[in-house]
From Swiss-Prot:
Compartmental location: Cytoplasm
Catalytic residues (UniProt): H173 (proton donor/acceptor), D242 (nucleophile)
Catalysed reactions, semicolon-separated: Hydrolysis of terminal non-reducing N-acetyl-D-hexosamine residues in N-acetyl-beta-D-hexosaminides
InterPro entries referenced in this protein's UniProt entry, alphabetically: Beta_hexosaminidase_bac, Glyco_hydro_3_AS, Glyco_hydro_3_N, Glyco_hydro_3_N_sf, Glycoside_hydrolase_SF, NagZ_Beta-hexosaminidase
Pathway where this protein functions: Cell wall biogenesis; peptidoglycan recycling
MF GO annotations: beta-N-acetylhexosaminidase activity
Gene Ontology process terms (BP): carbohydrate metabolic process; cell division; cell wall organization; peptidoglycan biosynthetic process; peptidoglycan turnover; regulation of cell shape
Physiological role: Plays a role in peptidoglycan recycling by cleaving the terminal beta-1,4-linked N-acetylglucosamine (GlcNAc) from peptide-linked peptidoglycan fragments, giving rise to free GlcNAc, anhydro-N-acetylmuramic acid and anhydro-N-acetylmuramic acid-linked peptides.
Claim: Cell cycle is one of the keywords in the record: yes
Residues that bind substrate: D62, R70, R130, K160, H161
Site (Important for catalytic activity) residue list: D171
This protein's name: Beta-hexosaminidase
Amino acid sequence: MGPLWLDVAGYELSAEDREILQHPTVGGVILFGRNYHDNQQLLALNKAIRQAAKRPILIGVDQEGGRVQRFREGFSRIPPAQYYARAENGVELAEQGGWLMAAELIAHDVDLSFAPVLDMGFACKAIGNRAFGEDVQTVLKHSSAFLRGMKAVGMATTGKHFPGHGAVIADSHLETPYDERETIAQDMAIFRAQIEAGVLDAMMPAHVVYPHYDAQPASGSSYWLKQVLREELGFKGIVFSDDLSMEGAAVMGGPVERSHQALVAGCDMILMCNKREAAVEVLDNLPIMVVPQATALLKKQQFSYSELKRLDRWQQASANMQRLIEQFSV
């Protein structure tokens, strides 16, 4: 599979989608709420994506929970990460949440949810209650449980947004945030610990500039991705860019420049979403590349949604997540 992830417009593939998915540089499709009508339609869409690609291809979605849950009707509701630490049995619930989220996606032939968020603190507009906590130990304890749940059912894990997005106020979807702190050691401690624990299969860097360290956003910085992530922290998994169509990546230039910089800096796979013309421009201008190690991120189990819903574990987890949402939602 190639390095580029892109999106499709609707519930079914268009003729253009089918053609573009055969391009050797395409390695993944990220789905959005607009791609989901019901459970059977989603299964049919994912089957069509895999058939059109004619080779292994990754299918992913942002389904971490709370406001970032693309598939809702017909799926269990997953709470925002912040809620787990507020509950008495929060660690147990976080593991159930990770398992439930991953299991329901796998039952619909989705390989990945880009999760969990390992950022610390609730102040950032882009992160907020997507964070597990405001201190290192709270984030580590509950994210570790969430990761265990994901892995137990066969889904690869993605830590984000390296080296820490939680302390900036600005939203990288809308602008390039600058983290002016002289040290981000506390934020980094979370990523370091999870890398050392061997529980992260992939990493997604932030579209954030940390000027005391490097002038480029982490997503396009060889300092962060090669020197720190690979060499200092010893991370061996796949590195995804965040969506390069976000305004946070604009400091790297146009679509082709952003993609080239991210790949040269150390990203293995890049996301270009919601701008088909930009994705086509990237495909037309990037050299043909393959990322054979990315096949390790394909889902490890296969089962139907009806089989899953018969499990006591599913019934308990789904009910517990709903109760947690009702308990803490204002």
